[in-house]
């Protein structure tokens, strides 16, 4: 680039730094500088699953199943699913991809009686939300979202093909069926460089003093 455009190394470095700040390129340690993937814009305005979100954006969603097994519920999982700490729940780990690019590492926790049914299906092609609602008649009525910026643990980094310590969005989502019954608790780790979340807020009328 220096020879082609007849500029100094300092000028090239500053230009690349500017492109990184603008999110147009990314620097990968030991590999070089690459054009950045365009960010997926995801609205947090209704309860939807990954497949529904990506299809709405014209992306091709796929999944890679890493694990599905019964594990003892820790205090957090037990609280979210309203079960006793230490009781067995189903944990399902998947990598979610859009157009072949890893977007999210998902950990899904289900009550044992539901989870043992869900894992008998092909979870690389059948969305869990669809199975719950259409196969097992468990309509998802509402969910609670908790969004946090965190750094990738070695496990998350390996799943998403990023460096440990890279920024990721962590969404904790508890979905409820009828009578406010929690049936699905998820920890969704999204690559921070590939997604942007937006929402719309309305202001409640205030009483005039």
Give the predicted meaning of each segment.
Residues 1-37:
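N-terminal helix-turn-helix
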Residues 37-209:
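All-alpha effector-binding/dimerization core of bacterial HTH-type transcriptional repressors
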